[in-house]
Every structure is written in C-alpha cells, then in structure tokens.
Amino acid sequence: MAAVKTLNPKAEVARAQAALAVNISAARGLQDVLRTNLGPKGTMKMLVSGAGDIKLTKDGNVLLHEMQIQHPTASLIAKVATAQDDITGDGTTSNVLIIGELLKQADLYISEGLHPRIITEGFEAAKEKALQFLEEVKVSREMDRETLIDVARTSLRTKVHAELADVLTEAVVDSILAIKKQDEPIDLFMIEIMEMKHKSETDTSLIRGLVLDHGARHPDMKKRVEDAYILTCNVSLEYEKTEVNSGFFYKSAEEREKLVKAERKFIEDRVKKIIELKRKVCGDSDKGFVVINQKGIDPFSLDALSKEGIVALRRAKRRNMERLTLACGGVALNSFDDLSPDQLGHAGLVYEYTLGEEKFTFIEKCNNPRSVTLLIKGPNKHTLTQIKDAVRDGLRAVRNAIDDGCVVPGAGAVEVAMAEALIKHKPSVKGRAQLGVQAFADALLIIPKVLAQNSGFDLQETLVKIQAEHSESGQLVGVDLNTGEPMVAAEVGVWDNYCVKKQLLHSCTVIATNILLVDEIMRAGMSSLKG
C-alpha cells in the first residue's frame, strides 16, 4: 500500500507501470488530435465554443489554447507546445508529435524491462548529437527578399490554403523589410494588423502607412486630401474639468458669462494656433492639413477647423500615436506653446473610407514609413481570425530568419538526415543507452511520416524512398507533398527556422524525459479531494 494512503485514505495513486501507462496514453491521445494538422496538406479542425461560436483552424497553437484539456499530463504537453509558439512562433504541432512519439518508442523498450533512466540517458546523448548535427546543416545566407519570401511561404502554407498564402507572403515580407532598421531588433508592434469585413481574403494588402478605424466627426470636412501635412497631438480641444478637485462660484449672470467666455477662449486660442500654422505651411496651395488628436475636439473647434479646410480626427488610439510619427514623421505634441512646421509629418494621401456604419481613415504614400499596416480582408469573422493567426506566425518566421541569419531545409529533410546521423552515432554511445538513441532517431521520423500521410501517400513507402535517396545523394531530401517523391528541399525553397528546430529538440527531450521518470502519480492535493 502506498505510503500516502496511510496518511490520506482518500488519495488516488497510480504507481510504476500504471503511472507510465497513464502518461503515455495522454501524450498519444494529444498526438492523435494534432496529427492530421501537420503541414500544408493538413486538415482543418472546427472548434465550437459553449456559446456556439465556430473557429476553423489548423494552427496547433490556436487549437491547444482553445481546447479544454482535462488530463494533467496532456495539459503539461500543451503548455510546452504553446510556450514554443510564444518563443518562436512555430513548431507547436511538431512539438506535440515528437513528444508523443518519443514516449511511444520508449514504451516499447520499457515493456521489455529496460529502466526508464537508461532511456533518458540515451535521449540526452541523442539530443547533444542532434543539436551538433543541426549546427552542421544550417544554411547561413544573406537574408534577401527572395529567401525571406521562401521562409514566409513555408510557414504560411501550413496555416492557410496555398493561393491565400502566396498573397500573404509578399505582404508579410515587405512589411518586415519596411520597419527593419540596421543593427536594431525588429519590433513587430510597429506592424498594425487591421481587420476589415469586406471583399474576399485574397484582397488582403500591405498599406505603407496607417489605417485608423474611425473617421472625421464633422459632416463638412474633406473626405480626401492629397500631399497633406500631419499634426499629431495629445492636447485637449474641448472644455475639461480640472484634474484637482476645484470649484468656481459666481454671484451674477454677468460673471457666469465671463466664466463661459474664458473657458471658450482657452480652447479657441489653441484652435487659432493650429489654423495659423496651417496658413503658414500651406499658404494658397492645394496642400492638405490633417490633425490627429488623442484627446477630444468639441463641435465648435471642429467647425472652426472645417471652415479652414483642415481634417481633424479625435480620440485616436494611444498605440497609433507612436506609429503615426514613425509612419509620417513629425513629433507627437503635448502642448501648442511653440508650434513650428518642422514638428509636422507628411503623407501623400489621406482619405476616409466608409463601410456600412464603420469608417476607416487611410494615411498612405508616406516617405520611408517605419510603421506599416497589414489590412486583412475577409467575408466573415472566422476567416479574418484564421488569417490574423497565420499572419502573426508568418511575421515571426521572417523575424526569426533575420535574427538567426540562417535557415534549415524543411519538408522533413532535417529530421530524416538527423535520424540517420544518430543511428551512425549510436555505436559510440556506451551500453544500453544506445537503445535511447535508437528510440530518439525513430521518433524524429514521425515528421516526414505524418507529412506524407496527410498528403494521401503511403507513409512507409515514402519514408523508405526518402531515406534511400538521402543515403545515395548525401543531400538533405524531404517529401514533395504533391507527388510523394523525394525532393531536395533547399532547391525548391522550402525553409524552416533554425531557432524553431533548436527549441524543438530542447523542449521535447526535457518533457519526454520528465514524463518517463514519473513513477507515481498522487492525486492528494486539497482541492482535488473536496466532496
């Protein structure tokens, strides 16, 4: 009888073989759910929430976040996989598949009496060799637009259908290249992802500027201005209460009038400063003038600005204020005390677009914008969500490639070559730990196997062909998902991120090792025993 039982009769305990069986079945269960998602030919999953909302996705990260996973071990694996996505932006499904397969291969040896500790030693030896092999096969190259397009396409085609992936690929790469600065980390927050329920998903485009999800608040303001000066400010153009708690008292109607006039004059002086600046920079030309304010603008001020032909937008979102100055230039002002023309930004075109009851303001044709907008279009909500998730992963894949300065061949090529390298390395490992290395090598082959299976080909036949081709040619050969034949991934331009593969090897080995070394599961916590 378990020691914990004597202390706590209500505790539930699973020991030795039973504990291992529970853990391995959980890992395999999760693997079976995500197995069909892998790769460009993977199938979709439909998630229906309690409220009846539908989400169509084949992104492993979205699935693991949205699914309600009850089993503690499966939940642990799901958290590791989603952490992989948070760090690198890809590899979630591969993570779950490899952990499941490592446990499955280990189970074969454990059922024959091998101790889990020996297998885990083999796993560690295999991981060291695999990481060393990854260093050898990585391709260091200049990250030009063409290479980045290949990287983005490889990532995006696993999330959305090929035609849409090709449209998104160029937009994603161009947006990163627009905001990239020499010797500085890439800040993906400088790429605004704006949704518009309109037209079809292939109309998604890159706007070299900014799109704001609101319009001007005055009916007489221009809907379109060209060659416009942009004044970005965070100054109240409406009467506001004082920040400290204060009161004003008047004895007569005349005094009240004076108070109202003083309040009004305070705002009017600010508006006059804007109008004077506009006259100074525009003169009699047709140039436009746009004021974008984070705080409010009252109807009187809007009226005065409108009469001068100034387009004014109020209550702009805070996150857009930084992007505005990066896209258009200029300075975001907190006071109008010393307004000067060199504080203004510039945009070639500013126009308002009305879609149903929603209004959008486009600020385009900026000179060298350091902040851009990806405008996602789609006919319905779940298409927009799916594209948004795909774009986020695509952006991170491109950023990773630039940060790493290298890529590795995809389509299962690295895994096949790595498995062969591990089998050659096996004799140099002492004793029974060799079996752990063998299990690790076999587990890695799950990736090319599942890629072939999801494309409708015989997985054993495809794998044998690829291994034979790799042995003969010595090149990194992957699966051609259209024909099921071997292909040299590097020649076709199928590239994966180096940091994703590296993280994958680390996290899968650690979690599989920890799960294998669990020999007792105790359900004896306070909360689990209530009732």
Curated annotation (Swiss-Prot):
InterPro entries for the chain: Chap_CCT_zeta, Chaperone_TCP-1, Chaperonin_TCP-1_CS, Cpn60/GroEL/TCP-1, GroEL-like_apical_dom_sf, GROEL-like_equatorial_sf, TCP-1-like_intermed_sf, TCP-1_chaperonin
Ligand binding (Mg(2+)): 90
Molecular function per GO: ATP binding; ATP hydrolysis activity; ATP-dependent protein folding chaperone; unfolded protein binding
Sites of Phosphoserine modification: 205
Any one of the GO CC terms: chaperonin-containing T-complex
E.C. designation(s): 3.6.1.-
Crosslink (Glycyl lysine isopeptide (Lys-Gly) (interchain with G-Cter in SUMO2)) position: 251
Binding site for ATP: 39, 91-93, 411-412, 496, 501
Domain of life: Eukaryota
Subcellular location: Cytoplasm
CDD domains, sorted: TCP1_zeta
Residues annotated for ADP binding in this entry: 39, 91-94, 158-159, 411, 496
Family membership noted in the UniProt record: Belongs to the TCP-1 chaperonin family.
Quaternary structure and partners: Component of the chaperonin-containing T-complex (TRiC), a hexadecamer composed of two identical back-to-back stacked rings enclosing a protein folding chamber. Each ring is made up of eight different subunits: TCP1/CCT1, CCT2, CCT3, CCT4, CCT5, CCT6A/CCT6, CCT7, CCT8. Interacts with PACRG.
Protein name as it appears in the record: T-complex protein 1 subunit zeta
Organism of derivation: Pongo abelii
Gene responsible for this protein: CCT6
